[in-house]
Amino acid sequence: MARRSRGEDQDELHCQDTDSDVPEQRDGRCKVKWTQEEDEQLKMLVRHYGQNDWKFLASHFPNRSDQQCQYRWLRVLNPDLVKGPWTKEEDQKVIELVKKYGTKQWTLIAKHLKGRLGKQCRERWHNHLNPEVKKSSWTEEEDRIIFEAHKVLGNRWAEIAKLLPGRTDNAVKNHWNSTIKRKVDTGGFLNETKESQPLYLLVEVDDNESQSGTRAESQTIVPNWPVDISEIKEEDVSDEEVTGLQELPSELPAADLAEHNEEGTPDDVVPEDASASVASPYKWVVEAANYLCPTSVPALNEALDMIESDPDGWCDLTQFDLPEEPSAGSSSSSNSPVRQTPSKPTPSLPNVTEYRLDGHTISDLSKSRKGELIPISPHAEVSFGTPPSVLKRQKKRKISLSPVTENAPSTSLSFLDSCNSMTPKSTPVKTLPFSPSQFLNFWTKQDTLELENPSLTSTPVCSQKVIVTTPLHRDKTPLLQKNSAFVTPDQKYVVDNTPHTPTPFKNALEKYGPIRPLPQTPHLEEDLKEVLRSEAGIELIIEDDVKPHKQKRKQGLRRSPIKKVRKSLALDIVDEDMTQNMPALPKTICFKRTQPVNFLSRSLNLSSSNRKNDSGLLNRAFVQVQSEKMSYRKMPSHFRPPAPMTRAWKAVACGGTQDQLFMQEKARQFLGTLKQSHTSRTLILS
């Protein structure tokens, strides 16, 4: 993205709900949010007095300046502003105006677009209309660059976007928040392996000096101990800047060095023999692991491997106790982890001067400007003998260095100001190598026991085996869960529903202690069959006339099948006549199962029996056992229509007796005394 100059578009400041972005606010003016009353008052004043005298308009606001009032009107309240989406005509107009005026005159461009601000035109161009903006999908390499740069720079998206040609800061920010951040939180980048990269010599060659074919002995900057640099991806480098491994030419004028010193670089950047030696170029070699390591030293490689294995253990370099004046004879120290490093130069480089990168020097790079050199202490010879104290501690940590870029007109190594921070500005957070869900989904033995024997205040979630009991009988069936975890059912359970004890009943029953199982009460069909068979010698045959209507249940409510008492039964008495060859059998009553309706809305139809005596079996209030022998005749193929029930049976069945009426009246009086303090809850037992 193009960098805006300081004096460009002074009237392009974006006015939001606050005035904190208005420059040079003085006179004790507040920077608080504009209220709706202030907006309405400003609109009224502008309509009455116009936009010529903003100081007069600001005098009506005790805590607002004329700039605040003007910016509020021009950027927010002006009815001529267009804040909607851009049309194709507007986009085409912006492209034509950019070709005509360039990418700096946004105020002039905005004057040709009615209702648009210069800031809107600028953002529209840089984020959407610029042909250099990439709109393709993000690659893994770009994700890695954003990940590494974010560790160093944080949320400085404009600086990170400079490392990705063709990507805007807005696109980088959106991609981080939508994709990369989630991948980092889940540890997606931890398992990826680092690909090996070739060595690059990051130097600048002057155009005039590059024509000379003379080459001289070079000085190589070698750290005494491994300086850990965070992984920074290389930018796209042109062919004329870096081509393979290059060396500086033989002549490096002293005037160039003096020029760099005038720019703010310390004098100790130049070695002591720089003035005497004419040929003293510098060579930087960036290895695949991004360390300043021009030579292949076994001990140094060992140290680098140790750093790679435990990057989070390294602490800040500014806290290291580094020796300032290492002795020349310390190269033979026995306790040095890099004592095997040869102190004499290699045959190919006879005059090699080694420089040590001090931790404080590296930290000072964050305060330097673009184009400055790295300050190096002017020691003629630095030994590898004395190891730093951090290597003795065997607790290492990576720190970040800014990536290196090149300046064409100068012969120096420059660092991008986008990567100036040497140490993290906030407490580093170590990414967890595991998922917290592993602990959340882990069940202990106690949890299993609690699920198998839930307390009175808990409601079972799902059950595979259910015992049909009364509401006061607790289900002791253990819960069988899939993979020892609650699984949301993916199907709707219609009739198979487990009875749930309502919470108010649970709370009321807790005071009476544990619930003991009670004998089965005759409210189920099986119990009715057994009672009628044993007491009256009647066999019940239940037939379904209409299939039960499937009710839709919410997903997650799993209930086991339970048979409820039928609210409406049609009693059909089977003919007593049986074949003479069959023995005496108990009488059979056929119950036809009908659709569930209100118990009091329908009358019970009783079928009359074709007995020898005229008195029906159910014409009285109670069932009596008949002692007479049944005749052996064939059962008729069809049943006679049932006779209407008598008044005596209707009084007993429908609650018309004196004791039933008395209990109903008492119940109404009791319910009438209750206070309706809260909304009653509907109790669904089906």
From Swiss-Prot:
Top-level division of the source organism's lineage: Eukaryota
SMART domains from the UniProt entry: SANT (SM00717)
Coiled-coil regions listed in the entry: none
Domain (HTH myb-type): residue spans on this chain: 26-77, 78-133, 134-184
SUPFAM superfamilies: Homeodomain-like
Annotated spans, Disordered: 1-28, 315-355, 493-512
Ranges of biased composition (kind: Low complexity): 326-343
GO cellular component, one term: nucleus
Main location (coarse class): nucleus
Function: Represses v-myb- and c-myb-mediated activation of the mim-1 gene, probably by competing with other myb proteins for binding sites. It is an inhibitory member of the myb family.
Assembly behavior: Component of the DREAM complex.
The name this protein goes by in its record: Myb-related protein B
The organism of origin for this protein: Gallus gallus
Gene: MYBL2
